[in-house]
Each structure stands twice: as C-alpha cells, then as structure tokens.
Amino acid sequence: MCPSDFSSRSLFLEAKEEEYKQRRRVPLDSRRRVRRACLSCRAKKIRCSGSEPCQACIATPSQCKYADSLKERTPSKQFIAELSQRQKCFEYLMELLCPSLPHDTRSLVKLCKHVESSLASGSDVRSLLIPGSIDQSVLKVAATNNKDDSSAVKSANVSFPSSSTPPSSDSNFSSIQNTDLNTSIKFTENISANAIHVNQDKVIRSANNLIINSQPILPVRSFLDALGEPIYLSPTSSTYFLNSVLASLQLNSSNTPESLLIDYQSKIPEDLSSSLLPLELNTLQSTPTSVSVGSASSQGTHEYSIINLTSNHSSFSLKALKKIAHNLLPPVSVAERYANEFFLRYQSFFYFYPPSVFSNRYQILADGLVNSDTLDTGFLAVALLIVVLGHFSNNNINVLPKEVQLSHIDSMIQISEQLISSLLNRCTLSSIQAVFLLSLYHFLTGNFKCAYSYLGFAIHSAHTLGLEHGSTDNSTLNEVSTEETSIRICWSLRVLASFLYIQSGITPIINLFPNGLNSLKLPTVVPELEARHLPSSVFHFVAIIKYAEISVRSLNSLYESSSDYLMDVSNFPKLLLKVERIYSQARNWKLNLTHQQLNGTNDTSDLLFHSNVSLHLFYHYLIVKVSCPIMFFYLNNWYSVKPSSFTKGLNNKPSLEDVFSNLETCYESAKAIVQLSSKLLSAGQMDKCFYLEFEILYCSAIVLFLFSVMHLGAENPLLESIYLLEDMGSRTIDSKVRLEKLKSAIEIFDINSATEMPINEPLSASFESVNKENSQSGYMAWQNWVTELSSSNIPLGHALGNPESNNSSNSFKPSHPSQSFLVNESLDFSSNPKEPPFLPWSEALLNMDMQLNRLGP
C-alpha cells in the first residue's frame, strides 16, 4: 500500500534521492575533501583529517608524518627537455676539453678526482681548461694506478714526427690491424706547404685528436707519390691494385714508381701545394702578381697597390685579408654564372650552401652595404671557393670570353685558406661550410692528405656544433630549412669521407654509417633550399648517399679477410658469394633510381645530364672495384694454366665456370665506363680539371689492361681509355706519373689488342694513332655511318655483325667452357660495322630539310 503522501511522480523521486543520501558513509554536513593524507593513515587505509597531527593519529598514539610534496611531484616536460639540453651542452664541452677521453662513468670519476686533487694542490683552474690536456694527464695518472689502462696512455700520447715513416706492413691482415695507430694518423702530416698561417696547424691537431680512437678498418701500405712523400693506401685504391698486378706479372724494376719519378722530377715545382693543383694554378710561381686593396670595377678588372700576393700572408691582419678577399670577388653577373655551374655540378652529390641565401648575401657584398670590418669571414671564404670551383667546371664546357675569365684564381685559393685559418678557433656553420669546401677542392685536385685533414676538422666541428641534431647558428632560414640544411651537410661530410675511402683506401675518420641509413633522416625537397631556375638535385643526393653506404659496407666486408689479393683457394667460394651479393645490392640500387636518372644519359641538353651520367659511372665503378679480387685470383691461379686444363675440381680449385658471370660483369662495366666517359667528352662536360672522373677511368683502364694481358674478351676499348686519360691526365703531376706508369706497363707486355688494329701489332705502337682528332658528332657522324653501312654489303633486315656478338654474354660464354674468354685471333673484328652515333630527331630532321631545300646553315 502506497504511503498517503505518495501522490505524484516527483514525490517518488525525492524519496529515492533521500534514501540514497542516507546510505552514504559520510554525512553531507561532515563531508570534506582532504588534499593529502599522512603516511600512517595511508598505511592503514583509513580516512585522514588532514590536520597535523590528524585525528586518527591522536586516537591511536602514533607518529603523524606527511610526505614531502616536492619529492612526489613529477617533473614537467619542459624540465626534462632543458635537462637533456643541459646534458648535451656538457657533452660538447667534454668533447672540446677531452677529445680522447671515454665518456663512461669510470673515466669521468677519475677525471673528477684528478680535478679535485689539482685544485686542492693549488693549481690554477685556467691550466686545467686547455683542450686536450685534461684527458692526457688523467690517462697518465690512470696508467700508474691501473695497468689495464696502458693502451689508453699509448693512444693519448701518440707522436707525429714529420720525418718518420710507418712500420713495415705485414702480409697478414690481423697483425696489421694490431699495429700502432700511427699508420692511420700520418695522413695529417704536412697538411699543406702553402699553409703559411700558424693557426692552420690547429687543423692537424684537431684531426689527430679526433682519429686517435678510430680503429683502422683496412691495412695500409706505404708507397711514394709524385713528390716522393709516403702515402698510405689500402687494397681499395687503384694504385695498390696496379702495383699488385705488376708484381704478379713480374715486371722489371725499371717500372717502379721511383724510376718513373726521375723523369718528372724536373717538372715538379718547388711548392708542394701548387704541384698538386691544376696546372693553371702554377702560374703564380712564375709570374708574381702585385695587387693592392681597391674596389672591383664593373668589368671585373681589379687594381691594387703594392701588395705581393706571393709573399707571406702571415704578416697581414685579418682586416687586410678581408679587404683583399672582398676585392678579389668578381662582379655579380660573373659570380652568378659560376655559382649556378657549381650548384648544378657539385650540389647534386653534396650540399654546401643554400643557393638563394648565397645569391642574396653575395649581392650585399657586391653593393658594399656591409663594412669590411664586419664582413663574415666564413662566407667570404665560401664565396671565393664556390666561384673558383664553378670557374673550373665552366671551363670544361666552353672557352670563356675574356671579360668573364678570372685572372687571380691562385690568389683566391690562397686567400681563402688564410681566411679559413682564422676560423679554426670558432665553431660556426659558416666555418664548417668553408672547411668542407676546401676539403672538396683538395679532393678534386688529388691532394688526398689535405682533404683528409680538413674533412676531419669539419666532421669534428659539425659534431661539436650539433648539426646531427639540427642545431645551427643560421638565423636567415626558417626552422624547417635550418634543420634540412644541417642534415644535408652531415650527409655531405659522410659522402666525401666515403669517396676518400673508395678511391684512395683512406680509412674513414668515423664510423660513417653506424645504423645504415637510419642514423640520420634522408634529405627531402625544400623549395627554399633549391636553386632558382635549376632543377632539384635532391634525388641525386639521396641516391649517392645510398650508394656510399652500400660501397663502404661492401668494400669493407670484401677486403677485410683478403691478404694482398692472394686468397687461399679454399676461401675463394666465400669470396665469390660476397661479390655476387654485392652485385645484387648494386643492381637493386640502380633499379631504384628514378626514370630521369636511368634514362637521362643521352639528352645532352638536360641540365642534369652530367649528374645522370655520373650515377651510372659510380655504379660501374663499384662493380669494377669489387671484381678486382676475382681478376687477381684468376691471374695468380689460372693464367699460367693451359686452356685444356680448365676442368672442374683441378687442384681443388673452383672451375672456370664459377668465374664466368663475375668476369663478364666486370668487363662490361669497364667498357661502359669508357663509353660514358667518351659521351661526357663529346658533350663537353668532362671534368678535365679534377681528379674524380680520372680515377674512375684509370681504374677501368687497369682492368681492361689486365683483360688484354690474359686475352679475355673481345673489342677491348683499352686504347680509347688511354686516349681519354691522356686528355684528362695532363692537369696534375700525380696523374701524369700514374698514366705513364700504366703506359710503360703496356709497352713492356706489347699486347695484341683486339680493337681496330692489325694482329701482331704492338699496343705501344698505336699510342700515336689513337684517334687524336676530335671525332665527328651529330648529323655528319650519322651521315658517315649510313654511308659506311651502305657500302659494307650487309643485307638489310638482318643482324649486323656476327650473330654471336649481338648478345654480350655470348662473347664470354662459348659452347666450350675452356675457351670462354679466349679471343680467336683468326676472327677479324674490324669488319664489324660500328654502332650508330646518337642523333636527336630534331637535329636530324632540320639537317635533312636544309639539304633538301639547299638553305644552308
């Protein structure tokens, strides 16, 4: 029965709410929120009044104690971020003060005890803040207390005598890797003969401190360069490979580098640096230039007072050097031409400076809006080097008019080196860019020891500045562009170090790719960082980064277990598997290129034509590099054996069939390098001034020479490669010596070449008749080819030449495996018609119309 007052729905809801309130444990009038409870109430899980002492602790005689609120509070995100930045700051300071001290807890505790004991003994704090002094003293103290640290003392007190030579290398790789680290440090000796400024010695000391803890990846060998100084090479260098081949072929002592050096001793200038530079720069030694500080005229001519640029610049102040550098800069129109050529040629594979920022800052310099005292020293050096490198690249394409030519190239390089010497005490982005550019210049001119030292300083400065984390001092770009610039410069430093390792065998300064390509974010397209009116080259940059990672890892794994190319026969199958694995990785890299990069090697009007061809050159260059041990193994084990003895399992050796695909791939890559180099030469884009493409073609010529010696393959383009090398190798003394060494080896062997020359005619006799005139190109070459084809009596609609020669693998794999690489001397390869020259359809139709209508050009 419902109660009497239960007359509506609202009364029912009120009754239910009152019943719910009465069921609560704490009455409404006595309910109170307590912000914190004491530790005793927390342990007993009872209600605490929040007072001190609380009611529960008073009732039960116990100690009422509250927890510290500051200790319980979790740190904020801002505090954690600031703490991590604080830790980075201390790490950077430790890198500067103690570059060779490990940053583990044990070493830091020893450092702290040493500093405390030094301060307690009354030592001055300033004496403890000298970079590189704390770690050496700590390691000395640790060596007296603990015998286990003797190796650390040895690494911290390495001496660098300029006249000493490294210990003789043993043939065993394991024993070489345990030798003294002097062999990996001697690259920094005598950084440059024209390093007149005393501060340039800091480059050597910084590079030495950086590479003290670096372990040599490959053994090194001591040879003599063109100047009689020792250079240290590992098996990845082409010079090492050529010396190993000539030693296996038992050449006479008359072909050693020392005897070849005698003929060129009179041609070597007294200045060390100028002999390694292009010959255009050697004019400074013969014709001193007296210039003075003045303003640049509009025609690009410069007038100076009585300052001899060939004299010692150490007497000049930094202010005077800035004035000289400012007046050596060409006008804006000329500088833009050279800068565009530089950005198009070299920023496809490296990244040095944002083009838009360079253009704006150069315009400010040219307009004289900034006082010479406040000029950015780093940008002055960057501007000089960019203009110089762009000038050399532009000279490869065409002959420049007189008003555009630079008359003080040598002075610009020397002044830039002096400006960089004043930047060594600073760690800024502009100083890293300037040192990096100078390292690239020395690398391109073949002065690898200087390039190695400057590159080591640039890498150390970039690490100290924190470029890997996007920390720069550049305020002219936004946050995204600044981070992207830092990433690109870090990748560029690693790519240049990879090139030094691949070409010259110089051990990398740091572990270039510790986590593969995951150590840094790959570059992306940022419009603010691209050059105006020029296509973006970011995809070429990403491709060359992946190439460098594959090459360094592959060559390291390939050569680390080999000893002077004299591998044991039982280890040859493992080596063969390694080479085939590298082949597949290189092919995958090439297949992942863009369509323009794969098929852009024919259109010479494309602005990225040289970059596209260079990617293909690098691919074939890697194939040739990794194939050298296979060829050397074949030379030492099978070359002296008769062809009928090539049976499977002979003397526990692998059969010749196992080497078919590898030697064929190497031979085709060597031929492709010659063809691509000829294409660059005909297009006027061959880098004749610099060393990079010369080294690739030189390595290909060595391989072709070895194929000719062993009578392997057909249509060997060795003569064409020698002609190209003669055209390219006349710029530096070192390249001349290396080319003469290869030619003298060919003359001794007197090879019967399979190219367009009679049988039994020596190869050395054909040097003078190697197509020394420029070959025709374009429509005339195509017309001559049609005429030659029509007069060869070949039926139309059929394959040209022998059916077996259409497939490239047929010339390497005949029916009988024992005759796979032997050239049949009875065949006349000169009767095969030539391949048609490349001719754009637009040019062909235009010339046809001109001939039909007799319009004339």
From Swiss-Prot:
Keyword Cell membrane among record annotations: no
Biased composition (Low complexity): 159-175
Lipoprotein keyword on record: no
Protein name: Thiamine repressible genes regulatory protein thi5
Gene name tied to this protein: thi5
GO molecular function: DNA-binding transcription activator activity, RNA polymerase II-specific; RNA polymerase II cis-regulatory region sequence-specific DNA binding; zinc ion binding
Reported function: Transcription factor that activates the nmt1 promoter. Regulation of thiamine repressible genes. Negatively regulates conjugation during meiosis, by inducing negative regulators which delay conjugation. Involved in thi1 regulation.
Subcellular location: Nucleus
Compositionally biased spans, kind Polar residues: 803-819
DNA-binding region: 38-64
GO biological process: DNA-templated transcription; positive regulation of thiamine biosynthetic process; positive regulation of transcription by RNA polymerase II
Keywords: DNA-binding, Metal-binding, Nucleus, Transcription, Transcription regulation, Zinc
Main location: nucleus
Region (Disordered): 152-175, 797-819
Taxonomic lineage from the root: Eukaryota, Fungi, Dikarya, Ascomycota, Taphrinomycotina
Cellular component annotations (GO), alphabetically ordered: membrane; nucleus
